[in-house]
Amino acid sequence: MFKVGFIGTGVIFDLNILGYLNNPDVKITCLCNRTTAKAKEKVKKFNLDKNIPIYSDYREMLDKEDIDIVEILLPHQLHAEATIYAAEQKIKGISVQKPMALTLDQADAMIDACKKSGSILSIYENFLFAPHIKRAKELLEQDYIGDPSSIRIKTAMGGKGGWKIPISAEEWRRQPEKVGGAKRGSPVLFDNGWHDFVLAHWFFNEEVEKVFAWTGNSQGLDAPAYVMFKYKQKFEHVVPQYGNMEFSLLPEMEIPSNYYPTDEFIEIIASRGVMKINQGTSIGNKMSTSDIFAPIVIIRDGKVESYSDFEKDWKFSFINATNYFIDAIKNNKRPILSGEQARYILKFNLAAIESAESGKEIFLE
């Protein structure tokens, strides 16, 4: 049985912990949070061992506790140093919340440290394990709509509703040196937007040649924002492949959600059909229960098909992601978003931010 320690017990902890609670291969044996009272609240909330060790310093926890897996759920500027320290303690499995790091140099240092220690590094990406995303990917891999030529990912965010976010969590995301990205910080493109950059790469399995982006400045956020990109075409395709991401704010819309008041709507156009993914974190859950918007819709051969044969709740993306990571550690497998793969996503993301700041098209070399 693998012993697991958590560094950080903020809001996202409530989802990251779910996959560990009923998995027979693991046991949560220690927690760390700068404010230990918050960690104690989580012990009660999730019925953990009341005598579980709680630390305020992650270094002390990693020094004293004999653990096999560590979940790093810290503000972005701490990802690299915590990962490197965990690797130096030869922790077998290291899972890091997105984004991977603030810079490519930090990402390289994380990768090198884990290679040196033999640690398996994974950047946590629940979106790849969301049931509706997995189903959409399966349909693409089955060549059901032909060769994909374009992808559009539209993120709607910032509405009323959803769970309560502590002021402290909002505050550090408004500090450029902590959230990362642009000189004035990028809480949209670099934090929430990370998921979209991952999906753009994962759905097409192609690297990006160039990117152009524009960002506004509303409500202290780098939004609205628009990102356009062209794929390299490593493989032969029917037509050249392009994509775009759009980030819009809905400050007055009531968004029913058990989680963040945010959603991602995806459209993929291919040589023989079109796929529309309506399922999402919050609005998508409500929409997909209606007769109008099925979770996945495919238009092909003059017909419209819908798919809903999967779990809808966003929590399953976390449970699935964690179970996958545990299995990767158990069987010494390369994670789906390894350090090297996440470094590429970081490069793609930072290129878009550089474009927005410079007003120029950026090539990914």
Task: List where the protein language model places each region.
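Predominantly a Rossmann-like dinucleotide-binding segment in NAD(P)-dependent oxidoreductases
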Residues: L128-Q219, G359
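Active-site loop of classical SDR/Rossmann-like NAD(P)-dependent oxidoreductases
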Residues: R34, E311-T322
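C-terminal helix-rich "cap/oligomerization" subdomain common to oxidoreductases
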Residues: V26, I69-E71, K232-V238, K286-T289, ...
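Hydrophobic residues in well-ordered beta-strands that form the structural core
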Residues: S95-V96, L121-I123, I277
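Beta-loop-alpha module in the N-terminal Rossmann-like domain of NAD(P)-dependent dehydrogenases
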Residues: I52-A113
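N-terminal Rossmann-like dinucleotide-binding module
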Residues: M1-N47
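Contiguous beta-strand/loop segments that form the cofactor/metal-binding neighborhood of enzyme cores
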Residues: D191, H195-N285, S317-N331
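Rossmann-fold dehydrogenase core element
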Residues: A109-F127, D147-I151
